[in-house]
């Protein structure tokens, strides 16, 4: 029902409001007409991690096809879906848009395979049963809190310093857990105490909407992109018709011709309308039983016919080799880092040497070797950033390397890999 969530929206009347707009550090003030969440939206929009999403994988790796979805287009789809839902239900669409825009800024190159690869590198010392160390939801929060910066009015690079509600939405956005009746949790918490993706619900209804919107946005679009690459054969198309017929009580041939389950715009519209019709503050965010079953079956279809297709599996071998080679190369610089000579150690890899040393300067206690000894260039480069990595601790240095790689685009990772293996 329209505006049925108006009384639970995150605004000045909400009992959660003061916590929702809280920032770790009071942000600098100037003549501004934006709300707190609009300000977060534009801070994310202008940060480098968001800009790099245009060259990060959504499903199809390092695509050169202008019409295939990248990670940046995906987050815009999520923002659009979340905004539409919030506007109809009476929720704060500006909060949802800010969360959606930033929800993947910590995503690894090469999509979820890249994420799994970086996680395996961090887990290799602890064995296969170790808790997951690298997951992009937490990494998006980490990037927002400690990595990404913007210049203030004096030209000093300052942290993004986002509101609690947006930060919470980043780490709690996991859309991979199939749930009905999603409701926000009651209490604020230390967001870094969350140990696994999908276990904790967001603090706001708007965060819950983004969590659902993430799933709505990718299901149909992934099928559309698979069609661009002729990934789906006739048997797959028949399977889609069968899914529509068995779950939505529609004739398969008619549903297929009308574009259902293939045309992303039709699919997104149908799922949004069903969610808005079925949801209430009492029931939570939910779909009808028919559409929920349809979502589950379509997700199974995507896994079987798209994500596990041999063409994508072949590329994952290359992607793993690429990320592992960069990781090993950077870990070999550890002794050089202690002496301020990382750029020299990587001098044969011009795209890697300067960017990695600058990363160390900005985010660690690394000091550069000069004619006057070791110097800290943070002030020279106007970085007001915390040294979140300690280069004197090898484990912290390893974490630093992993985070640096996670920020790479597909294209930059491939370029660096090429430098390393060429003679």
Language model segments and positions:
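Histidine-centered, transition-metal-coordinating active-site segments
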Residues: 1-72, 77-85, 133-139, 143-423
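Active/ligand-binding-proximal structured segments within catalytic/core domains
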Residues: 72-77, 92, 98, 114-118
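Short pre-active-site segment immediately N-terminal to the catalytic Zn-binding motif
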Residues: 83-95
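Helix-boundary capping/turn motifs
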Residues: 91, 110, 294-295
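Short alpha-helical catalytic segment bearing the HExxH-like zincin motif
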Residues: 96-101, 211
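Post-HEXXH active-site segment of zinc metalloproteases
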Residues: 98, 108-133, 228-235
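An acidic- and aromatic-residue-enriched active-site/binding cleft used to recognize and process polar
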Residues: 101, 114-115, 175, 215
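Short active-site segment of divalent metal-dependent hydrolases/proteases
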Residues: 102-110, 217
